């Protein structure tokens, strides 16, 4: 009976539920969603293999080849997954990074940043709490992409004055 009471006390404690919430979040953080069009396909596959080696679980929403296709078809799937809270981070790839970035940013829970170098990725995470990184496949090397991805995944949001600013982003949708 003592063990049952101890277990009950643990389950009732606020600390247990905070731990459980953070544990579930840490598991979701290890899942990275990827999406691309044909121009970003090769870089997406390179980054996908790299992330798997780092221990991440990848959900690849397409495209599946370098045959011409429309980035919106795949960006919306990733955006929808973030909106529903099924994943917390994503990476999108197209030729310039712009089209797929604009599309995924139409989703209310997405804060996607076009990152062409590691410094931009750092600021996007620190100041904007970006949860999607858009990579311009025609303008960066594989090594640059790896550096951007590493920074994007390892930097944290600073909060403070930046939190006030990003909280104003979705106000338009609430009106």
Model regions and ranges:
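Glycine-rich phosphate/diphosphate-binding loop of Rossmann-like nucleotide-binding domains
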Residues: 34-52
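Extreme N-terminal starter segment of soluble prokaryotic enzymes
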Residues: 29-32
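A short beta-strand-loop structural module common to alpha/beta enzyme folds
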Residues: 57-68
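C-terminal binding/interaction regions
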Residues: 35, 39, 118-175
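Helix-adjacent hinge/juxtasegments
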Residues: 74-114
């Amino acid at each position: 009976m003592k063990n049952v009471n101890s277990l009950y006390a643990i389950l009732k404690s606020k600390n247990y539920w905070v731990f459980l919430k953070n544990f579930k979040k840490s598991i979701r953080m290890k899942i990275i969603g990827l999406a691309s069009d044909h121009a970003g396909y090769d870089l997406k596959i390179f980054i996908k293999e790299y992330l798997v080696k780092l221990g991440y679980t990848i959900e690849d929403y397409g495209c599946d080849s370098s045959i011409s296709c429309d980035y919106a078809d795949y960006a919306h799937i990733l955006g929808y997954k973030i909106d529903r809270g099924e994943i917390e981070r994503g990476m999108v790839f197209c030729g310039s990074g712009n089209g797929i970035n604009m599309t995924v940013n139409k989703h209310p829970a997405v804060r996607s940043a076009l990152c062409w170098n590691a410094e931009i990725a750092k600021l996007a995470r620190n100041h904007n709490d970006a949860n999607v990184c858009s990579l311009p496949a025609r303008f960066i090397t594989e090594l640059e992409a790896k550096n951007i991805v590493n920074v994007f995944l390892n930097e944290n949001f600073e909060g403070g004055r930046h939190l006030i600013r990003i909280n104003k982003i979705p106000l338009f949708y609430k009106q």
